[in-house]
């Protein structure tokens, strides 16, 4: 090897001493943000909420351990607490802004609408991604409608009802739900002795005056089908299973755990921090989240009924109620494997197929095909 080759090798090499290594801290921090990409499914370890913290360790020697042991981290913390001025060991905790996950609540809501008592992790995560996209799209559309008003650009109940103007049954269902929630809130405030928030009542009265669509109480087929399905499911459960099923039916994004779940739901939507959203609007978004999950479960069960994998024994679909065979034409998805067999959880391909059919039916007109290039094209949402 000649002299020029050795010189190039010496220039490309870097020699770091132990003293320089001890004097210069090595920051173990988050990686630089990369370009946005398509959302990827997480692993099964992301179901449990974890508090992720990063450690910043100043090394004393030239040897750099790739995975420091907990004893070394604790030792570093004790040295910093001792207040030694010449110490080169420090321990700094940096909280990680991990994305908020609602896997537990979504799994309970899916179970309450007819899924298995142990939903698949991949299915729940896929529903979570669809839910976030749907809710952010609905809020964006409602904001565009609200921006036409100069005095109050914040979305209100009238804006969401304007988006649902072609579905009066859904408008009546949402109004009935919000009315029941106001009655329940007043009852709980009287029972617990807590003072009521009169500002919310004033905002609600202003919204009631803005509602220009007169919707009468109509026959809600979807709601009756869900109630019938829940009734048939409850008839074949044991005592402990019924208690768990009842708790799952109580799950929501605004009642359970109070302000904690409300703040978690707002962080899940990833809305701007400086955006002021009134409480009635957040209640409507929470209701639409509940309806979106219900629609996904409904379409997934109907997709399973229309697919070829519906291979079950006819007598195993008969429940303990004597009228089940006679009611199969009313709600056939109640008997999708229940009875002698174990209920099969909703799979990811069934959800994809259900969403494909929904988008195909919602993006077509009678007589001609409509694509995204049309002027009157609007994004399809499950809840509205």
Curated annotation (Swiss-Prot):
InterPro entries: Histone-fold, TFIID_TAF13. Keywords: Chromosome, Nucleus, Transcription, Transcription regulation. Disruption phenotype: RNAi-mediated knockdown in female germ line cells results in arrested oogenesis at stage 6-7. It comes from the Eukaryota. The keyword Zinc does not apply. It is found in: Nucleus; Chromosome. One of its GO terms (biological process) is transcription by RNA polymerase II. Pfam families: TFIID-18kDa. Gene3D superfamilies: Histone, subunit A (1.10.20.10). GO terms for molecular function: protein heterodimerization activity; transcription coactivator activity. One of its GO terms (cellular component) is histone acetyltransferase complex. Component of the transcription regulatory complex SAGA, a multiprotein complex that activates transcription by remodeling chromatin and mediating histone acetylation and deubiquitination. The SAGA complex predominantly acetylates histone H3. Required for oogenesis; involved in transcriptional activation. PANTHER family: TRANSCRIPTION INITIATION FACTOR TFIID/SUPT3-RELATED, TRANSCRIPTION INITIATION PROTEIN SPT3 HOMOLOG. Component of the Spt-Ada-Gcn5 acetyltransferase (SAGA) complex consisting of wda/Taf5L, Saf6, Taf9, Taf10b, Taf12, Ada1, Spt3, Spt7, Spt20, Sf3b3, Sf3b5, Nipped-A/Tra1, a histone acetyltransferase (HAT) module made up of Gcn5, Ada2b (Isoform B), Ada3 and Sgf29, and a deubiquitinase (DUB) module made up of not/nonstop, Sgf11 and e(y)2 tethered to SAGA by Atxn7. Taf5 and Taf10, which has partially redundant properties with Taf10b, may also be part of this complex. Belongs to the SPT3 family. This is SAGA complex subunit Spt3.
